[in-house]
C-alpha cells in the first residue's frame, strides 16, 4: 500500500519547550505536539496523528492506517541538538566551520544563524550522514 507522508516542523519555543506542527491534515483533523524534549513532543505529535485517524474514521472517511504513514521531521537548530544529543556541539562546530561559541548560542536558541551559516550547518549534517551511511564495521 502507498505510504502517506506528513511533513512536520520542530521548533524550540521561548518557553524552552518544543513544539511540532504540520500543514498536512486528514480532512478537518490537524496534527500538533508539545513536550519538554523533542522526543516527548514527537510522542505527543504521533498521538495527535492517531487521534486524527480515529476522528476521520468515526466521521466515515477513509484514511491511511498509522503503519502506512511516514513522518518527515524538519528541525530548527536547538531541536536538532536536543534530539541528537550525542553530537558534541564543539566538535560539530569545528567540523562545520562555524565559530564554537556562536554554535552553542544557536544550540541553546539564544541567537540564530544567518542564511549562509545555516547552509554550512546543513551541509555538515548531510556530509556526516553520507559518511555514516558509507561506513562499515568489522
Regions from the PLM with identified roles:
Residues 1-61:
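DNA-contacting interfaces and partner/effector-binding or oligomerization modules
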Amino acid at each position: 500500500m502507498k505510504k502517506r507522508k506528513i511533513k512536520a516542523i520542530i521548533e524550540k519555543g521561548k518557553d524552552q519547550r518544543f513544539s511540532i506542527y504540520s500543514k498536512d491534515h486528514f480532512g478537518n483533523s490537524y496534527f500538533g505536539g508539545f513536550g519538554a524534549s523533542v522526543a516527548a513532543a514527537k510522542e505527543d505529535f504521533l498521538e495527535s496523528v492517531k487521534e486524527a485517524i480515529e476522528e476521520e474514521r468515526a466521521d466515515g472517511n477513509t484514511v491511511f492506517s498509522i503503519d502506512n504513514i511516514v513522518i518527515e521531521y524538519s528541525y530548527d537548530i536547538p531541536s536538532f541538538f536536543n534530539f541528537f544529543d550525542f553530537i558534541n556541539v564543539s566538535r560539530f562546530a569545528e567540523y562545520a566551520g562555524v565559530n564554537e561559541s556562536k554554535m552553542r548560542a544557536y544550540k541553546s536558541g539564544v541567537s540564530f544563524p544567518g542564511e549562509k551559516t545555516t547552509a554550512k550547518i546543513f551541509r555538515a549534517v548531510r556530509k556526516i550522514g553520507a559518511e555514516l551511511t558509507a561506513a562499515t564495521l568489522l
